Regions:
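Generic alpha-helical structural context detector
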Residues: 28-32, 41-44, 168
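Short beta-alpha junctions and helix-cap segments that line functional grooves
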Residues: 26, 151, 165-167
Length: 194
């Protein structure tokens, strides 16, 4: 059984390589990656619901090395005196900000810098294995290993309005799955039956 309660929520991703897919990559940076990320600011710094959160597209790799359906996932551990519903309400309030109005240009530029840094970290990881992983993924899934040379261009095409439209379409509650993990003390008593 869990020693500490946890919460995860995930949204279905847009089709790979679509403009919305690249917008979701930037939304991941805006909402969850780095100390300036909106969810991190709200859940960790302002509310103190958790000391950290994990998030990303394709939790078993990166946003480029998969083919097929995928999720953008956020997960965190929290204290037992904080209800999962409280955390979801705070998360929804933050996500609604990007769903209802475009992000400003400074936020988009910070997201691009973080994304570029993340991309080059992926490429250089494990003494170049990251580059091989991306080349293989683009060759296998897209028949286009040269796609690695054009990733930044794809992200640079994304506007604040595209980010809002993508958030509105994909980051809605009906497109989400929520997982709540409770400790034994929190779980309702189960009766055994015949």
């Amino acid at each position: 059984l869990a020693k500490k309660p946890a919460l995860a929520f995930a949204y279905h991703m847009p089709r790979r390589n679509s403009p919305e897919y690249y917008a979701m990559g930037l939304l991941d940076q805006i909402l969850a990656e780095g100390d300036d990320a909106l969810l991190r600011q709200e859940l960790v710094k302002r509310k103190g619901y958790t000391d950290s959160l994990n998030a990303g597209i394709n939790m078993l790799g990166n946003m480029f090395d998969y083919q097929g359906p995928m999720l953008w996932t956020v997960s965190l551990f929290h204290d037992s005196n904080i209800a999962a519903d409280q955390i979801m309400q705070a998360s929804d309030a933050v996500i609604d900000q990007v769903r209802t109005k475009p992000v400003d240009q400074a936020t988009l530029q910070r997201a691009m810098v973080k994304l570029r840094s993340d991309l080059y970290d992926n490429i250089e990881q494990f003494s170049g294995f990251g580059r091989a992983d991306l080349l293989c993924s683009f060759a296998l899934f897209d028949d286009d290993p040269a796609r690695i040379n054009h990733l930044e261009e794809q992200f640079a095409r994304i506007t604040p309005e595209m980010i809002q439209k993508t958030a509105e379409q994909y980051l809605r509650p009906e497109n989400r799955t929520v997982l709540v993990v409770e400790t034994k003390a929190q779980a309702p008593e189960q009766k055994s039956g015949n």
